[in-house]
């Protein structure tokens, strides 16, 4: 595939299906090896049901697939959470794109659809959680579409048996 952008009409954005497990696993496994994102296959498998659409929850996993081949090329999880101040905040989590499609606009197409959905759910803002030592390039990319850093989150990991 050459360096040109993928057109929106060449992509299908849809809900995650159980048949997407292997394709999404491969995308995340590659990210894990490159960026150590905390991906653990057994936990991904155990939480498969969380990626399924549930009408009573404001949480879904979106899939971007090529219309021509059906190849899954990107995924992203979105969720609306009511804050303790009473406002809904949308979150984009576990955003990942197949290596050969990075920089071709697929992630933006997927994120645009996700933000439309979050807005329709009544969200007043959308947040993206990134690693503190995240790639400066990603911050610049998100900045081009209106995202800016607003908070710092501190985390303490618990030891597991």
Segments predicted by a language model, with ranges:
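Conserved N-terminal entry element of GNAT/NAT acetyltransferase domains
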Residues: 1-19, 160-161
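Acetyl-CoA-dependent GNAT
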Residues: 11, 18, 29-87, 93
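Hydrophobic pocket/interface hotspot
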Residues: 24-28
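Residue-level recognition of the GNAT/N-acetyltransferase active site
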Residues: 66, 98, 102, 131
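Structural preference for beta-strand elements that scaffold enzyme active sites
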Residues: 89, 125-127
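Conserved acetyl-CoA-binding loop-helix of GNAT-fold acetyltransferases
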Residues: 94-97, 103-116, 144
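Conserved beta-strand-loop-alpha-helix junction that forms the acyl-donor binding cleft
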Residues: 127-138
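Conserved acetyl-CoA-binding loop of GNAT-fold acetyltransferases
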Residues: 142-152
């Amino acid at each position: 595939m050459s360096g040109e952008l993928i057109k929106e009409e060449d992509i299908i954005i849809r809900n995650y299906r159980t048949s997407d497990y292997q394709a999404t696993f491969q995308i995340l496994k590659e990210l894990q090896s490159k960026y150590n994102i905390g991906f653990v296959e057994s936990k991904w498998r155990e939480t498969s049901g969380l990626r399924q659409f549930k009408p009573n929850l404001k949480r879904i996993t979106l899939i971007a697939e090529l219309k021509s081949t059906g190849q899954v090329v990107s995924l992203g999880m979105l969720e609306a959470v009511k804050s303790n101040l009473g406002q809904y905040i949308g979150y984009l989590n576990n955003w990942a794109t197949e290596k050969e499609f990075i920089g071709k606009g697929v992630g933006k197409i997927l994120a645009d659809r996700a933000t439309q959905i979050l807005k329709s759910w009544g969200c007043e803002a959308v947040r993206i959680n990134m690693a503190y030592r995240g790639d400066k390039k990603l911050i610049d990319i998100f900045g081009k579409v209106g995202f800016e850093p607003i908070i710092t989150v501190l985390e303490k990991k618990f030891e597991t048996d």
